[in-house]
Amino acid sequence: MNESESEIQARLLAQALPFMQRYENKTIVVKYGGHAMGNPELGKAFASDIALLKQSGVNPIVVHGGGPQIGAMLNKMGIESKFEGGLRVTDQKTVEIVEMVLAGSINKEIVALINQTGEWAIGLCGKDGNMVFAEKARKTIKDPDSNIERVLDLGFVGEVVEVDRTLLDLLARSEMIPVIAPVAPGRDGATYNINADTFAGAIAGALNATRLLFLTDVPGVLDKNGQLIKELSVAEAHALIADGTISGGMIPKVETCIDAIKAGVQGVVILNGKTAHSVLLEIFTEHGIGTLIVP
């Protein structure tokens, strides 16, 4: 006899109950970006996942990126994107547009999606409540011919140096869901554009989050046969980088996970944001759907 839709929902809720209890009153930081952000249906599924986490007693915090949207706006305004060593150079005019797109446009779109579920989301960036302070990022690149490292001047690209959790602690005790754009001030008065992955890691570390989820366009970390690795320790992750199993763009992603764990996060997950309801599938099922990296 086939199950009705209501029977299926009841069964799934019963299976999820132990995990709801496990994460009750725990903080989960979700870095939202990639393909999921540009797909309206996936966006709605993401918003409903965040709402259900809140309704289940979890303290969810969303950090988002927006690289493609920034590039599109710069093109629209006739501003050429400049890159050094594969990284965007952010001059004064560009950082103003970055802040406008991240904190003024994308942030409010995500807030609106969550609010449509009946929950209350609030849009923030690192400037609000002096939550995050940054400084100019120090990046170097090695010249392939001379093997000499040179310092890159990326303008107003920053890295987090301080997180004050006061505002986030206040929001955790309220009904509000923080949605945070990775823009922050420096002690020098400048505004800095910060990589969303590292920004999310800094927030999660400061809060000693139970989980940090990175929604990406890939299933997670794959072994040499292309199979998903369900769980890795920090030591195992280092070994897989050393032997070439983890390569290319996955290296900085995994290194960010490791940094977050060193900062105090209990576990970091790389998962596929192109899967509908990926957040719930990761948190409220026994084996999850991504790669969990633990100390």
From Swiss-Prot:
Q: Which Pfam families match?
A: AA_kinase (PF00696)
EC class name: transferase
| Higher taxonomy | Bacteria, Pseudomonadati, Pseudomonadota, Alphaproteobacteria, Hyphomicrobiales
Q: Does the keyword Kinase apply?
A: yes
> What positions does the entry give for substrate binding?
66-67, 88, 193
Q: What does this protein do?
A: Catalyzes the ATP-dependent phosphorylation of N-acetyl-L-glutamate.
Give GO BP annotations, semicolon-separated.
arginine biosynthetic process via ornithine; L-arginine biosynthetic process
The pathway entry for this protein reads as: Amino-acid biosynthesis; L-arginine biosynthesis; N(2)-acetyl-L-ornithine from L-glutamate: step 2/4
Give the GO cellular component terms, alphabetically.
Answer: cytoplasm
The highest taxon in the source lineage is Bacteria
- CDD domains attached to this UniProt entry: AAK_NAGK-C
- Does this UniProt record's set of keywords contain Ion transport? no
Q: What is its EC number?
A: 2.7.2.8
Q: What is its main location?
A: cytoplasm
What NCBIfam families has UniProt attached to this entry? argB
- The name under which this protein is listed is Acetylglutamate kinase
Record's catalysed reaction(s): N-acetyl-L-glutamate + ATP = N-acetyl-L-glutamyl 5-phosphate + ADP
Q: Where is this site: Transition state stabilizer?
A: 31, 253
From the UniProt record, which GO molecular function terms apply? acetylglutamate kinase activity; ATP binding
Report keywords, A-Z.
Answer: Amino-acid biosynthesis, Arginine biosynthesis, ATP-binding, Cytoplasm, Kinase, Nucleotide-binding, Transferase
What does the sequence similarity comment in the record state about its family? Belongs to the acetylglutamate kinase family. ArgB subfamily.
Intracellular or extracellular location(s): Cytoplasm
